[in-house]
Amino acid sequence: MKSDSDLRYETLLPFLSEERTQRFDAVLKGRTRHLSVVLENIYQSRNASAVMRSCDGMGIQDVHLIEDINPWVYNRGVSKGTPSWLTLHRYKQQPDPTGACIQNLRDRGYRIAVTSPHVDGFNVDDVPIEEPLALVMGTEWKGVSDRMLQQAD
């Protein structure tokens, strides 16, 4: 099944110059699914949108949004259209959005790393990246949930 981004790209192709098509292809080949970003209940939608822009700029294709407490609202001024080019996995309608995200990542072979200034762990330069890795960022105020922290590898 093709993603929304794939369908958008295929729709645009007939209208693009050869040079532009080559540029798109080069950018898409630079994308990775080896590293994914998870945003857990980010309070300020503009912060989530800014992270998405960073993911787009670094070639990270998949962004997972856990929205059981704080829903993400599209912020055009900050995101600059990047959600159209990323694959967004939204967890908000399930009975357990955090659990659904964790299960999806585990089923796809991801290890889970959380960002936290409050726990001992790896320095960012020492994080093992041999296997697919999901990097989890929590709310601006409290950070990642206890549950997500317990699930971290």
Name these PLM-found stretches:
Residues M1-D153:
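Post-transcriptional modification and biogenesis factors for structured RNAs
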